[in-house]
Amino acid sequence: MSKKYFGTDGIRGRVGEYPITPDFMLKLGWAAGMAFRKMGACKVLVGKDTRISGYMFESALEAGLTSAGADVMLLGPMPTPAIAYLSRTFQAEAGIVISASHNPHDDNGIKFFSGKGTKLPDELELMIEELLDTPMTVVESSKIGKVSRINDASGRYIEFCKSSVPTGTSFSGLRIVIDCAHGATYKVAPSVFRELGAEVVVLSAQPNGLNINDNCGSTHMGQLQAAVLSEHADLGIAFDGDGDRVLMVDHTGAIVDGDELLYIIARDLHERGKLQGGVVGTLMSNLGLELALADLGIPFVRANVGDRYVIAELLERNWLVGGENSGHVVCFNHTTTGDAIIAALQVLMALKTRNEGLAQTRQALRKCPQVLINVRFGGGESPLEHPAVKEASARVTQAMAGRGRVLLRKSGTEPLVRVMVEGEDESQVRGYAEELAKLVTEVSA
């Protein structure tokens, strides 16, 4: 059964446009509360990023949840993975995050976590959707839920992040720049790295509700690259608005993407005999990652794009490490979902163990040229179903004769078609990608 509201990563859209409206959030809170209450006594944690609309939606969700008899614990601005962690430690039935991740401030959305800190099962999302289409009824007055605020949430999460590296670990002597994207990591990330001994220069940690992800963070790396050079730092770390993506910059100012971070973490675990199985990437993972892992004898499989699919594959195989080139990195040996701060700490530990800088360590992975072009399209039939697009994709794949890949897919969160071509010759790859992107644009007109 297809879902009406839930996408690949919860519910997301433009603020003020259905369903990202206060009245829908009120009803969503009620529907979620009713669904969670079927599991017994109901306690729900609610956190958010720094978007100005978060206050509005927090109040609406709070009203809806309590009207269904659920108790609500408000966490305030916190990284998405912190809500997953705290949902477990508070033994809540669920955690809710108000965020649109790496999107600009005029988007917002809702993500749900189970009480185990994992994404909600499909059947529970479907139950919530069914309840959304029924009349809203308030529980009797004596059963209305209570609301409390958790004032030490940041401190709890900071200590959890620090616990992901061995006791006594010190990054003293390491000079780093971190870009918090004016988002949910703005308080906790500087504290984590400073308390572990690093010298920290902080960028984009003055959220005003409107500047989240605005020319900063993991989707706009220029500011961090410049700062690493001007500050003579050892490396830079960029988070996205809700703290579940991380990218890095080495001391030369070069960007280190999620594929490279995943390789560094996996190789470190492998060398210490703690990898447990293989590595999960996605259809967008660079071919070079697969080849480099193969050289180490590490199995590699590709999941669909989206961290929930990476997580599902990890769970099915009982493996520990997976991620996306966009910077979602999952370390199941420490947490239940993609966590940018914890992933960054694992990279720093790997560098410390090898006594290498990031620029040196990343050389072990030689990436194949990969060109990604995003093509925006309107409503109607997907351009991917057009015969001309299918024929061109097959022709390009055949022309690369097994030494490259073509991937055309719709975004799960935006009206975009992603055109990706990968191979050994960069000019050839770019030519093929531009040819396919032009064709997708033409058939979308």
Swiss-Prot record:
Cofactor(s) the record lists: Mg(2+)
A GO term from the CC aspect: cytosol
Top class in the EC scheme: isomerase
Transmembrane segments: none
One BP term from GO: peptidoglycan biosynthetic process
Post-translational modifications reported in the UniProt record: Activated by phosphorylation.
EC id: 5.4.2.10
Molecular function terms from GO: magnesium ion binding; phosphoglucosamine mutase activity; phosphomannomutase activity
Catalytic activity line of the entry: alpha-D-glucosamine 1-phosphate = D-glucosamine 6-phosphate
Annotated keywords: Isomerase, Magnesium, Metal-binding, Phosphoprotein
KW Secreted (keyword) present: no
Alphabetized InterPro entries for the sequence: A-D-PHexomutase_a/b/a-I, A-D-PHexomutase_a/b/a-I/II/III, A-D-PHexomutase_a/b/a-II, A-D-PHexomutase_a/b/a-III, A-D-PHexomutase_C, A-D-PHexomutase_C_sf, A-D-PHexomutase_CS, Alpha-D-phosphohexomutase_SF
Residues annotated for Mg(2+) binding in this entry: S101, D240, D242, D244
SUPFAM superfamilies linked: Phosphoglucomutase, C-terminal domain, Phosphoglucomutase, first 3 domains
Active site per database record: S101 (phosphoserine intermediate)
Co-factor binding details: Binds 1 Mg(2+) ion per subunit.
Modified residues (Phosphoserine): S101
One Pfam family here: PGM_PMM_III
Gene3D superfamilies per the UniProt record, alphabetical: Alpha-D-Glucose-1,6-Bisphosphate, subunit A, domain 3, Alpha-D-phosphohexomutase, C-terminal domain
Described function: Catalyzes the conversion of glucosamine-6-phosphate to glucosamine-1-phosphate.
NCBIfam families: glmM, PRK10887.1
Similarity comment: family membership: Belongs to the phosphohexose mutase family.
Name of the featured protein: Phosphoglucosamine mutase
Organism: Pseudomonas fluorescens (strain Pf0-1)
